[in-house]
UniProtKB/Swiss-Prot annotation:
It comes from the Bacteria. GO terms for molecular function: DNA-binding transcription factor activity; sequence-specific DNA binding. PROSITE patterns: HTH_ARAC_FAMILY_1, HTH_ARAC_FAMILY_2. The lineage of its organism: Bacteria, Pseudomonadati, Pseudomonadota, Alphaproteobacteria, Hyphomicrobiales. It comes from Rhizobium meliloti (strain 1021) (Ensifer meliloti). The keyword rRNA processing does not apply. Residues 223-321 form the HTH araC/xylS-type domain. Keywords: DNA-binding, Transcription, Transcription regulation. This is HTH-type transcriptional regulator GlxA. The keyword Transcription applies. The gene is glxA. CDD domains: GATase1_AraC_ArgR_like (cd03136). Residues 240-261, 288-311 bind DNA.
Length: 324
């Protein structure tokens, strides 16, 4: 049975560490628990690093963490988070954990995913009909691998027995919510203040900066087009359609790109699509021709030539280096 959430008990919070897990995400999730113990003057939480069979797991920065065995120790945890990094080949190595994660979920243990950990939860079948999130960079690969799933663009999502978070520093916000859930908002505020985390974000807060910050412009017509470019990847819209969306003429749209971006409409759109393609090459199992068509190119050859011009390597060479 899942451990009690009674505030008098010590909650064991497990972290299933996937090889090359993101150390910042792990620290952002565990340090608030340590601070809660310190501020309360008694143990409220026990941090339990986990791995199949135990042993040590190295983070993306090379720091190794000693782990208990997931199978034998998971049942005593109140929550088990899957903490992963950015390498799909590492996510694939977690298949041996899927059965255990499903079993723990059936026992009433909350299961979570941090950074790309939601990909592992999806592969285990734990995200069907659930609200969840994942790091924005991994969302395209997840949607390609699991078309029936639709991650939310949120910093974190608490959906009953499932807790997911985009990673980075967002676990600070998620842990604030989870501590408040158990111990009240006043105590959670004390924990966040301990880390100078004064601006605690709401769950639905965005993971990324605004389009204006990302693209370095505040022009409303240009921003409308740039944001549409980020979503209209597989079936790119032509200049006329984009100009209509922005409420300007095609000629005016061209002028906006030259004046504010220093590059043309087509060049900007192509770069956005190619950067999306690069993420799919690194993180998805799609073939190169499938990625070419999924990013709006008329042929794999056209895609390969454009990719090489921008990144100075072919899609095939990047795929081999990524090990996908």
């Amino acid at each position: 049975m899942a451990a009690s959430s009674d505030s008098r008990n010590v909650q064991r919070i497990g972290f299933l560490l996937v090889r090359n897990f993101a150390l910042m995400s792990y620290a952002s999730a565990t340090e608030p628990l340590r601070a809660a113990n310190l501020l309360a003057g008694r143990p409220l939480y026990q941090i339990v690093p986990l791995a199949p069979g135990g042993g040590t797991v190295a983070s993306s920065s090379g720091l190794s963490v000693g782990c208990a065995d997931l199978e034998s120790e998971g049942e005593s945890c109140h929550t088990v988070f899957v903490c992963a990094g950015g390498e799909p080949t590492d996510w694939a190595d977690t298949s041996a954990s899927h059965t255990t994660l499903r079993r723990l979920s059936r026992l009433g243990i909350r299961i979570g995913g941090i950074s790309s950990g939601a990909f592992v939860l999806a592969a285990a079948g734990l995200l069907d009909n659930r609200d969840f999130t994942i790091h924005w960079e991994h969302a395209p690969a997840l949607k390609e691998a699991f078309p029936h799933l639709n991650p939310r663009h949120a910093r974190f999502v608490l959906d009953g027995g499932i807790a997911t978070c985009g990673g980075g520093v967002a676990p600070l916000d998620m842990m604030h919510a989870m501590i408040a859930e158990r111990l009240g908002t006043d105590f959670a505020r004390r924990v966040s203040d301990w880390y100078l985390h004064a601006a605690v974000a709401e769950p639905a807060a965005p993971q990324r900066g605004s389009a204006a910050e990302r693209f370095g412009t505040n022009h409303p017509a240009l921003l409308a087009v740039l944001e549409k470019m980020e979503t209209a990847i597989e079936r790119p819209l032509d200049r006329t359609a984009m100009a209509r969306l922005a409420g300007v003429s095609p000629r005016h749209l061209d002028r906006l790109f030259r004046e504010h971006r220093g590059t043309g409409f087509l060049d900007t759109y192509r770069e956005i699509r190619l950067r999306h393609a690069r993420r799919l090459l690194q993180q998805s199992p799609l073939s190169i021709p499938e990625i070419a068509y999924a990013t709006g190119f008329s042929s794999p050859a056209h895609f390969s030539n454009a990719f090489k011009r921008l990144f100075s390597q072919t899609p095939g060479s990047l795929r081999r280096r990524s090990g996908s």
